[in-house]
Regions:
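ATP-dependent carboxylate/acyl-activation modules
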Residues: 1-104, 110-113, 122-133
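Histidine/acidic-residue-rich catalytic or RNA/ligand-binding cores of hydrolases
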Residues: 117-118
Length: 133
């Protein structure tokens, strides 16, 4: 099953924590799109990723992708110390809102979403499994 596409841009500090979550989306059959730094990180870790360049890199690819309507979720954690990342993050979040795309800025929330998607897809309820022990 293919659920669609997630667009990911993750602050460096969050990348190790984000990796297993993004891998779960990938294993569920989502297409992964990401900004250049995140793309490089994901590819190094064996996740096929389509690179979209940022507005600060002179590109409107992210907005075109969101506007086309094939992106289901945006995951955007920002490095508050990096001015360009803050601005890009703001632009991405605004574009997501304008195109009615669900946006996550906290990895904890993403984890909850994945639990639900996996339960629907794989038909495995971890809650039931724990109760039967």
């Amino acid at each position: 099953a293919n659920y669609g596409t997630i667009l990911v841009t993750i602050a460096d500090a969050d990348k190790p924590r984000a990796l297993p979550l993004i891998r779960r989306f990938y294993n569920l059959g989502f297409n992964i799109e990401a900004t250049s730094g995140t793309t490089r990180f994901l590819r190094e870790n064996g996740i096929r990723t389509r690179c979209l360049h940022k507005l600060s890199e002179g590109s409107t690819e992210i907005f075109e992708s969101l506007h086309k309507g094939h992106v289901n979720y945006v995951i955007n954690t920002i490095d508050i110390n990096q001015h360009s990342a803050r601005l890009d993050g703001y632009d991405i979040r605004r574009a997501a809102v304008e195109n009615n795309v669900t946006i996550f800025t906290a990895l904890e929330t993403v984890s909850v979403l994945l639990d639900v998607l996996e339960e629907i897809t794989l038909g495995v309820s971890t809650i039931d499994a724990e109760q039967n022990v």
